């Protein structure tokens, strides 16, 4: 048997059929790999959301303008799809708070999905994703709440984890109050 030269395969021992099979198997492997890479983000986007959710962070630059105008902080709830504590925090505390007077008027409530490549405009007006935004804040534990100003600076102590459920609402209220105080210059 002689050597067969193929541009895609290099030198292959055997007949032209072996070269064709090798070439086809490489094309198939590349195609399947590409299909898997392309399908992964689509599959991630198709996952069912939690039953209770805040408005997703989509345009934080616009939220920053509203924050400055109304002199209220931005409440970022960092969440993960498979986090049962996030579901509990959203259902029992965060979503009711966001809908309830006076809290709905004291902060802009936004949700950030740390395990999703969802598009978002950051505070500087740059396109990024929820995953990258969470990484910028160093968030790896969920749920995490960060109260931020219109530049995206954390202005209150972050609330990490569900902590003690009996006191969770109080921790959230303290974080919002501290953020309002910092924005309005009434606390240090």
Predicted regions and their residues:
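Boundary at the C-terminal end of the N-terminal hydrophobic targeting segment
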Residues: 39-46
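N-terminal secretory signal peptides
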Residues: 1-22, 27-36
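Short active-site neighborhood of thiol/selenol oxidoreductases, capturing the structured segment around
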Residues: 71-82
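Structural micro-motif
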Residues: 131-146
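A short beta-strand-turn-helix
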Residues: 56-72
């Amino acid at each position: 048997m002689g050597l067969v030269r193929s541009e895609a395969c290099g030198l292959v021992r055997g007949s032209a059929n072996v070269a064709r099979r090798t070439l086809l198997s490489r094309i198939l492997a590349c195609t399947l790999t590409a299909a898997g890479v392309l399908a992964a983000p689509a599959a991630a986007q198709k996952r069912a959301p939690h039953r209770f959710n805040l408005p997703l962070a989509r345009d934080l630059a616009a939220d920053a303008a509203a924050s400055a105008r109304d002199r209220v902080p931005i409440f970022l709830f960092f969440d993960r799809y498979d986090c049962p504590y996030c579901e509990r925090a959203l259902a029992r505390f965060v979503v009711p708070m966001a809908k309830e007077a006076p809290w709905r008027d004291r902060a802009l409530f936004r949700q950030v999905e740390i395990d999703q490549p969802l598009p978002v405009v950051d505070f500087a007006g740059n396109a990024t994703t929820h995953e990258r935004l969470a990484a910028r804040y160093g968030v790896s534990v969920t749920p995490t709440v960060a109260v931020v100003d219109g530049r995206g600076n954390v202005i209150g102590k972050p609330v990490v984890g569900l902590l003690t459920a009996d006191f969770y609402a109080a921790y959230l209220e303290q974080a919002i109050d501290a953020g309002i105080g910092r924005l309005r210059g009434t606390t240090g």
